[in-house]
């Protein structure tokens, strides 16, 4: 457990929690650690879950698949980030997504529903984790709304521009790395990979952006100036 202390201390779920309080809460939440090889499924659609997953090492993809196998990537989680919070907090909820190991991954599972009950001791760290959990759920809801905005665009180019604009605005820079491969980005935006690659090439030829693998530079009349929100 000690080897993962740096990750636990930076995890949003445990923000503002001291070392002693963290040890108490991990015990209270029945923390357990498991490892999964690349490509394996940690959770499958149709299952019920009672635990939140907190990634300690590696990364996971949250995906939806229809009965024909068409994939839609909803999000990606890395060290310090959580998954399955909503389903773990809602009694009887059935997963409509699967969680895949994008790489070899180590995950801590927590019985998060225990923290939703009233603590007899009125512990401040108990309340703090509830607030942190609500913050995480709100942040993920905002990200999901962003994704819906991207997918609502009519063309592949419009979806790409919506996605890149949101990333630039979030980071307040025109140059950044994205967390997806080409296939993953296509699955995230709901387009064909071949069409996405062609459109990226056209946008580069037209001087709208430049890229190398997952590194992108957006080119606008403002690119050589400070990002608008940073002025």
Predicted regions and their residues:
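Phosphate-/nucleic-acid-contacting segments
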Residues: 154-159, 163-231
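Short, small/polar residue-rich loop motifs at catalytic or cofactor-binding pockets
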Residues: 28-29, 47-49
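Glycine- and acidic-residue-biased ligand/ion/polar-headgroup-sensing regions
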Residues: 39, 50-63, 78-80
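Cyclic nucleotide-binding regulatory module and flanking cytosolic helices
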Residues: 1-38, 87-90
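Short phosphate-coordinating micro-motif centered on Lys-Gly-acidic
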Residues: 41-47
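Cyclic-nucleotide recognition modules
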Residues: 73-131
